[in-house]
Each structure stands twice: as C-alpha cells, then as structure tokens.
Curated annotation (Swiss-Prot):
It comes from Neosartorya fischeri (strain ATCC 1020 / DSM 3700 / CBS 544.65 / FGSC A1164 / JCM 1740 / NRRL 181 / WB 181) (Aspergillus fischerianus). This is Nucleolar protein 58. Residues 581-591 have a biased composition (Basic residues). The keyword Nuclease does not apply. One of its GO terms (cellular component) is nucleolus. It comes from the Eukaryota.
Length: 591
C-alpha cells in the first residue's frame, strides 16, 4: 500500500510520497531521519500547493485549526483520489476525520503516534525537500503567520475590551475602601485639635478640604471657606472654632494631618474620574445592560462572570442569583428556599419595589438583561449607528419594566407617549401653568329666607265621610286596563333609587377596603369569600395567604387535641376520686 504524507507549512501544502511502503513500521526510522540526506532518501515531494498571500495563509491555517478541509486542500488531495490502495498520514486527527468524510475519498488515513517521528524530521529538513525554499524565508513566513493567527484567535477590537471594565470596577471598590479608611483617620487625627468640626460636617471630602484650607483652628478669622461650605455652615464652623475645646497641636503635627488630607482629596478626584471612565466604557461595550441595571451593577456582573461573552452565555436564572453562590449552595444543602437575587439586587428597579415584589422584579429584570447581553456581545453595528440605536432594546425594556412595577405597586402608570432619555429615565415635562379659575357669581343667587312659610291651622276634630269598600274585581279592573296608582309608582321608584344607592355605597366601600388591603376589587371579593381576609381592632383589612391559613388550621387542631387530652385526664381523675370515696363509705358501713 502506497504511503503519502500531508504536511501543512506556512508557505503552503506539501504532499510527500514515501519510498518505502512500510516506512512507519521501521524501528530505525528516528535514526535514519535525523539528517537531511536520510529524510530525502525516505520521502520525495509529490506536489506542493503554495499560498498566494499572507491573508490566504491565515485563512487556510485557521480552517485547519478548526478541523475544516478548504477547497485548496481538497484540490491537492484530488491527485491521489484515483489511486488504489493508498494510505495518507496526517498530523491532526481532527483534520483526518474531516478528510475521510470527503465524497469519493477512499483513502486509509493514519493519524496516530507512529507518525510523530517522520513529521518531526520533515519539519526540521523541509527546505531540503522543497526546491527553491530557503531556511530564512521559511522562518520569516512562520513568524508572520503565527502573529496573524494569534491576532485572529484573540479577535482584537478596542470597543470590546471588557478587561478594562473588570479592572476598573475592582479598582473603584478598592478606592472606596481606602478612601473611607483615610477619611476616618483624618477625622480622628484632626479631631484632637477641633473636635466640634466632625459633628458639623458629615461630608468626608469637604472635611479634608477644610483641613487643608484652614489649618490651625486659630486661623478661622482669616480663612475663606466660601468655596467649600455654604454661608450658613461657614458661620457655624467659625463660631465653633472660636470656642473649641480641642487641644493645641504643633506645626509638624498639622503638616502630617494635611498630607493625609491631600491623599483623601486626591483619591476622591481620581475616583470621580474613574467613575466617569467606567460609565463611558459600559455605554460603549454593553449599552443595553447599562440601560437596564446601571453601569456599576453591570460592571460587577461582567467582572463576576469574567467577561462579557461568558455573561451573555449565562441563562436568566444564573444572572438572577449571580453573586449569591454561597447562599444558594447552603440552601440546597439544608433544603431551604434558594435566594431570589444576587448582585442584581442593587439595581434601581429592584430597589424601587417593595418587599413582596422584589423577587418578581429580579426575575423579570434578569430575563431582560440576558436578552440585552446577547445583543451587546454578538450584535454587529454599522459605523452610522448611534448610541441610542445600540441601547434601544434596553431602553424599551426598562420602560416596560417600570410600567409593570407601577402596576404591581398600585402607582399611576406613565403614559404610552412619554419621552424616554438614553439613560432610561423619562424626560421631564414642561413647566405646569395654573390658569385663573372662574369666580362664583353671588348676584345670581335668589334669597328665599326673608318670607316666613305659611302655616295652615289644622282642626283638632275632623269629620270623615264614610266610603264603601270596593270589590276585588273593581280594584283589579284599572290595573288590567293598564293604569296604576300614583302612590304605588312613587313607592317603586323610591325603592329602586334606594337599591341603586345601596349598591353604589357597597361598591365604594369595597374599593376602599381593597385599597387598604393592597388588592384589586376582584381579588378582594374572592379572598373575602374564601375567608382569607382578616380585620384588626381598627377594622382595617389584611390579606392572608393560603400557607398562613393552613398553619392557623394546624395550630387550631393541635390546640383542640390538647384540650381533649386535658379533659380526658380531668375525667379520669374525677372517676378515680369517686371510686376512692365509694370505697371509704363501704369500709365505714362494714365497721
């Protein structure tokens, strides 16, 4: 069986033919192939397919790495396609499987450890096997192709560098810790000299700037603090400095305190700059995620997942509890309820929800964030696309979530036509102007209280004339003729109006009670029929869940069982006492 060897080089594809059919089974293959002459005696060049350019070489090698057969390689293999009893040695088993799947290719493929020695020898002495190929050119082409292949694998893009976000959010958290530590140290240190200042100023940055500006508290008269503090606080600080109870410090102590205060101010300025940089990078890399959860929460999610691509591959359920892994595994181990949210808890939408709705909002927000992440990671935008176009999905989803949250909380909904800004917040409306209302015209009133009402003198005794009682038939005749008495019609109208008013009153009462219970009118009626509404001492309703009702029923059953046991015990005790009394009576009778 004829043996062919396929070699992939940076210059092109080389197809070599072995002079010995049993070349791979020889024991002295490594020793004979150690020199260029030995390799040339073992194999000879059958065909060579050269790459036209560096770009072509990159495409071909990238396809080979993925285990794909390119048209150029397939055309080279067509030369040995018609030969019978042929075996082909390939260095990569994945490539060998792909070649074996080619239509009409009946070749025995060899891609195991027996080919390592011959491939090593061919790579070392390749210029001697291919005429016109110099060793210097070979090394240059290999170096250039390796650089291009590495760049191709990295898929370098300055707009998709999520490593910068990971480092920036980590540095931001470290700065917050250090800034807090240094600021507290400044307060404790300078507090020996001016202890009243810490109670007046709560802002750490303003405190450090004031220490740098004023120095000794005795300089309060000449120090201009208008740039740091408002007028009211400035007067309070100066008055406190005038009658301070602090100790005196030396100039050397003040210099060290001011050096630390300079560090605090410098860290604060750099933190503000870093926060702006992080916001810009998040809007460029993940605009939809930023519109939904904010730049800080989005950056922490990306940092926790490792990269934007890894986070986009995660399902919504994973994004929802990302950051709460310890609580999740603890709950699974102890068979308790799993956590509802992780890092996503700090998003503004979840912060706006009440306790009972936080879990629902976390689930819905994680689902929308997973969709936005896939768009951010995998979408390819044109150069003409604006930031609003890129963040359109996240902005629209945030607006829908805000409406859903308002519906759950019972708050008024925003109108559908409201304008939404790039940050997801609604644009403020124009200034509301109050028009002058129409005044009440008092001249149009008619005064009727000047004339007293006429009173008719009623007789103490009146004569009533006797009237004959009409028959039942005569009473029914006018009714049958389609006429009714005026009195009966008035009474029926009054009754219908009373019923209508009572229905309205009941509906308004139901609406009020439903609002107090935090439910809709339908749910309030349903729960009231089921007995799931309880009233406190003031008459305010509150809804109870099915779990609470079950617990209450179980407790009532336990209490009833306990009472029955106590009754049985008391009955047994009474029977025992009665038996003892009877025995005593019998003994007395016998005596």
């Amino acid at each position: 069986m004829t043996l062919f060897i396929l070699t992939e080089t940076s210059a092109g594809y080389a197809l070599l033919k072995a002079k010995d059919k049993k070349l791979l089974k020889r024991d002295d293959l490594a020793t004979e192939a150690s020199t260029a002459e030995g390799v040339s005696n073992l194999v000879k060049l059958k065909s060579f397919q050269k790459f036209d350019s560096a770009a072509t070489a990159l495409e071909e090698v990238a396809s080979l790495v993925e285990g794909k057969v390119t048209p150029r390689l397939a055309s080279l293999l067509d030369e040995i396609k018609d030969e019978k009893k042929v075996s082909l040695a390939v260095a990569d088993p994945k490539l060998g499987n792909a070649i074996g799947k080619l239509p009409g290719m009946s070749i025995q493929l060899v891609a195991d450890s027996t080919t390592t020695d011959i491939f090593r020898a061919i790579r070392e002495h390749l210029p001697t096997l291919i005429p016109g190929l110099l060793p210097q050119d070979m090394s240059t082409m290999s170096l250039g192709l390796s650089h291009s292949l590495a760049r191709h694998k990295l898929k370098f893009s300055p707009d998709k560098i999520d490593t910068m976000i990971v480092q920036a959010i980590g540095l931001l958290d470290d700065l917050d810790k250090e800034l807090n530590t240094y600021a507290m140290r400044v307060k404790e240190w300078y507090g020996w000299h001016f202890p009243e200042l810490a109670k007046i100023l709560n802002d750490n940055i303003a405190y450090a700037k004031l220490v740098l500006k004023m120095g000794m508290r005795s300089n309060w008269e000449t120090a201009d603090l208008a740039e740091i503090l408002p007028e009211e606080l400035e007067g309070t600080v100066k008055a406190a400095a005038d009658r301070s109870m602090g100790t005196e410090i030396s100039q050397e102590d003040l210099e060290n305190i001011q050096a630390l205060a300079e560090q605090v101010v410098g860290f604060a300025e750099y933190r503000q700059q870093l926060a702006g940089y992080l916001t810009a990078r998040m809007n460029a890399i993940a605009p939809n995620l930023t519109a939904l959860v904010g730049e800080l929460v989005g950056a922490r999610l990306i940092a926790h997942a490792g990269s934007l691509t890894n986070l986009s591959k995660s399902p919504a359920s994973t994004i929802q509890i990302l950051g709460a892994e310890k609580a999740l595994f603890r709950a699974l181990k102890t068979k308790h309820d799993t956590p509802k949210y992780g890092l996503i808890y700090h998003a503004s939408l979840i912060g706006q929800a009440t306790g009972k709705n936080k879990g629902k909002m976390a689930r819905v927000l994680a689902a929308k964030a997973s969709l936005g992440l896939r768009v951010d990671a995998l979408a390819e935008w044109d150069d003409d696309a604006t930031e609003e176009d890129k963040a359109a999905l996240g902005t629209e989803a945030r607006y829908n979530l805000e409406r859903k949250l308002a519906a759950m909380e019972g708050k008024p909904l925003k109108p559908r036509g409201v304008a939404i800004g790039p940050n997801g917040a609604s644009v403020q409306p124009k200034k509301f102007e109050i028009n002058e209302t129409r005044r009440y015209n008092a001249d149009a009133d008619a005064l009727t209280g000047d004339q007293p009402a006429s009173k008719k003198d009623k007789k103490l005794i009146e004569e009533v004339s006797d009237e004959e009682m009409a028959d039942a038939d005569s009473d029914e005749e006018p009714k049958a003729n389609g006429t009714k008495d005026d009195d009966s019609s008035d009474e029926s109208e009054e009754e219908s109006s009373k019923k209508h008013k009572s229905k309205k009153g009941k509906d308004t009462e139901l609406e009020k009670m439903a609002e107090k219970a935090g439910l809709s009118v339908k749910r309030y009626k349903r729960k009231l029929e089921r007995g799931e509404i309880t009233f406190d001492a003031n008459g305010n309703p509150s809804a109870t869940s099915k779990k609470e009702l079950k617990k209450a029923k179980k407790e009532a059953k336990k209490a009833s069982k306990g009472d029955e046991k106590k009754r049985k015990r008391s009955d047994d005790g009474e029977e025992a006492d009665n038996g003892e009394k009877k025995k005593k009576k019998k003994k007395k009778g016998e005596e």
